[in-house]
């Protein structure tokens, strides 16, 4: 086999080449309860004001502000309670001179009233109460339309539907939502050295860990995943299974077979399916031989057989492709700053991604590398919630340096919460 010369490109350029391709999924309609994590296919426009009416944000008494003027500790002013309403009810009383309506949170402000006195600001008797401070017009009132007004775009096309977006959709009566269909993914692990999870270990063999990991990463994004039988190092069978996967899926992910060894057939497979190779070497560690190809609106990802490199390739390249296909507004990985808490002295000829554990506090983020960090390492992935990104050309970093990190998880331990 002729060894192909590969020219590395920067990580950012690699992602840009992916999202520059003309690839989009169709719009579909799903039930609201099935829309979580989908991408909106259209703007959502407010069809009425929120709040729809002036309402009370507290439990208390609705009064006329003019009647409270002059109130003080030495001059308590008395009000007579003429009605009592809860959320969902509307008073038919007109609040008059030194009158009040007992009102619960969320209830509509009665006619004549223009301020709310919280219970704790009063001294109550049977059907009266007194106050010791004046209230201004609209004090303690949520005004009609103060959050959104009719015609406002409340959710944008391309926005990810999170639980908050579901609340907005429910507010405006969307029992069904127009979204972009999520791509389906085929996962194909390659390598004659691979055994299935339930196989007995043999000399020179390892269990397939990449396939289950990629499946989990894809399912975490809400994607439908097809798992294919582990492929041995055979060109003809490799071509056949990739062609089959391309007929059924929008994205095909293979793990292994992307290096330049005698048994790495992926370049030949891409030629056989007439795919355009977008890049086949990235200036990064691990995962420098990550390869991405494109044909007929579909992506083919050749991820490294090394678990950490495979994980890194999915986070950096597969995720942006999925978002791009769904028309997401934001497709690039989000980078934040963190303080490195221990030395990392290894030189970095290329951009290096280190599996790590970040801690987010009110004082900022700190990060510690997650155990053994070679490209073939597996355990470090399980204990990481981010990747540290060290720039190429650097000669190591000392504890206390500020570094860039990409969060892959964002939960915190209970003792880290500041309440």
UniProtKB/Swiss-Prot annotation:
Keywords linked to the UniProt accession: Magnesium, Metal-binding, Molybdenum, Molybdenum cofactor biosynthesis, Transferase
Lineage of the species this protein comes from: Bacteria, Bacillati, Bacillota, Bacilli, Bacillales
CDD domains linked: MoeA
Record has RNA-binding as a keyword: no
Family assignment from sequence similarity: Belongs to the MoeA family.
Pfam family, one: MoeA_C
PANTHER family, per the entry: GEPHYRIN, MOLYBDOPTERIN BIOSYNTHESIS PROTEIN
Enzyme Commission code: 2.10.1.1
Signal sequence, renumbered to the chain: none
Domain of life assignment: Bacteria
EC supergroup of this enzyme: transferase
Name this protein carries in UniProt: Molybdopterin molybdenumtransferase
Biological process according to GO: Mo-molybdopterin cofactor biosynthetic process
MF-aspect GO terms: metal ion binding; molybdopterin molybdotransferase activity
Catalytic activity: adenylyl-molybdopterin + molybdate = Mo-molybdopterin + AMP + H(+)
Cofactor mode of binding and number, as noted: Binds 1 Mg(2+) ion per subunit.
Cofactor(s) this protein requires: Mg(2+)
Pathway annotation: Cofactor biosynthesis; molybdopterin biosynthesis
Function: Catalyzes the insertion of molybdate into adenylated molybdopterin with the concomitant release of AMP.
Annotated NCBIfam families: Glp_gephyrin, molyb_syn
Protein's gene: moeA
């Amino acid at each position: 086999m002729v060894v192909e010369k590969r020219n590395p490109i920067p990580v950012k350029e690699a992602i840009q080449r992916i999202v520059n391709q003309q690839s989009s999924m169709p719009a579909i309609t799903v039930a609201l309860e099935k829309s979580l994590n989908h991408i909106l296919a259209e703007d959502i426009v407010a069809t009425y004001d929120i709040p729809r009416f002036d309402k009370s944000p507290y439990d208390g008494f609705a009064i006329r502000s003019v009647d409270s003027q002059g109130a003080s500790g030495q001059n308590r002013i008395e009000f007579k309670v003429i009605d009592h309403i809860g959320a969902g009810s509307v008073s038919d009383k007109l609040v008059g001179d030194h009158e009040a309506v007992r009102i619960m949170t969320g209830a509509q402000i009665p006619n004549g009233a223009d301020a709310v006195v919280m219970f704790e600001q009063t001294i109550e008797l049977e059907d009266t109460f007194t106050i010791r401070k004046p209230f201004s017009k609209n004090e303690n009132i949520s005004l009609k339309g103060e959050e959104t007004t009719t015609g406002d775009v409340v959710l944008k096309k391309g926005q990810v539907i999170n639980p908050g977006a579901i609340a907005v959709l429910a507010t405006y009566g969307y029992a069904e939502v127009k979204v972009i269909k999520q791509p389906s993914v085929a996962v194909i692990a390659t390598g004659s050295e691979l055994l299935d999870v339930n196989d007995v270990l043999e000399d020179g063999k390892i269990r397939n860990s990449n396939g289950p990991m990629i499946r989990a990463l894809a399912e975490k994004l809400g994607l439908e995943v097809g798992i294919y039988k582990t492929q041995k190092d055979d060109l003809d069978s490799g071509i056949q299974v990739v062609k089959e996967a391309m007929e059924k899926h929008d994205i095909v992910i293979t793990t292994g077979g992307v290096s330049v060894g005698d048994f790495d057939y992926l370049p030949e497979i891409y030629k056989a399916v007439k795919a355009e190779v977008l890049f086949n070497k990235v200036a990064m560690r691990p995962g420098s031989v990550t390869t991405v190809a494109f044909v007929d609106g579909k992506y083919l990802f050749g991820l490294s057989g090394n678990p950490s490199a495979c994980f890194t390739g999915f986070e950096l390249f597969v995720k942006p492709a999925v978002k791009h296909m769904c028309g997401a507004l934001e497709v690039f990985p989000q980078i934040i700053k963190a303080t490195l808490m221990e030395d990392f002295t290894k030189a970095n000829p290329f951009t290096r991604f280190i599996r790590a554990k970040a801690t987010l506090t009110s004082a900022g983020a700190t990060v510690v590398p997650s155990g053994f960090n070679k490209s073939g390492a597996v355990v470090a992935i399980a204990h990481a919630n981010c990747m540290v990104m060290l720039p190429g050309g650097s000669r190591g970093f000392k504890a206390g340096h500020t570094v860039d990190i990409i969060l892959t998880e964002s939960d915190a331990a209970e003792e880290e919460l500041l309440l």
